Amino acid sequence: QALGLFEDENGDENMSSDMTTVNSGGVTSAEGFSAGAIFAGIKTAGADKRDIGLLLSDRPCTVAGTFSQNSVLSPSVTLSKAVVDGGGDVRGVIANSGVANCAVGEQGLIDAREASALAAEKLGVSSDEVLIASTGVIGVELPMALMREHIPQIALGDNDGDEFAAAI
């Protein structure tokens, strides 16, 4: 009931119709979410560029995902899919752009795990509560030196959803 759920005449659980619409909202529009991003140098520099973003929920979230059906998946997709398929709660997301972390062999999985762990440490959550998303050039490994340097510097804010979006 607190979530606006109700059972209809068939006993199916549905959302209440008295929901609030948020126009021009973002990932931090909902209460309890904060985000931030930084330019780490993964992409070409620009005044409005960000290439690593973090998203945090102040409480565990139940998640669902739609993933690529391509036979070649990046380790970032594989890790996030495992978290979602495992049914565990999620509290954070790390997203990077500029490098897809795809078609890079075993190093891609090592790097995706480390990036998730770095994000988890910064967010104060467990690494199995973090999803990772990478987009960009295929065949290039995550630049872990840049990620190690810049992830701890990301400042999170309740109104920084646009910053996070710019990093995707």
What is the role of each PLM region?
Residues 62, 67-87:
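Glycine-rich oxoanion-binding loops at beta->alpha junctions
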Residues 55-56, 94-96, 132-134:
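Short beta-strand segments
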Residues 48-51, 73-74, 87-92, 125-129, ...:
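Short coil/turn connectors at secondary-structure junctions
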Residues 2-14:
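Short, Lys/Arg-enriched N-terminal segments with co-localized hydrophobic residues
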Residues 94-124:
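Alpha-helical support elements that line or immediately flank enzyme active sites
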Residues 66, 105-108, 141-146:
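Short acidic, glycine/serine/threonine-rich loops at helix termini
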Residues 113-168:
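Glycine-rich, mobile lid/loop segments that gate access to catalytic sites or pores
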Residues 11, 15-70:
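N-terminal amphipathic/basic leader segments beginning at the initiator methionine
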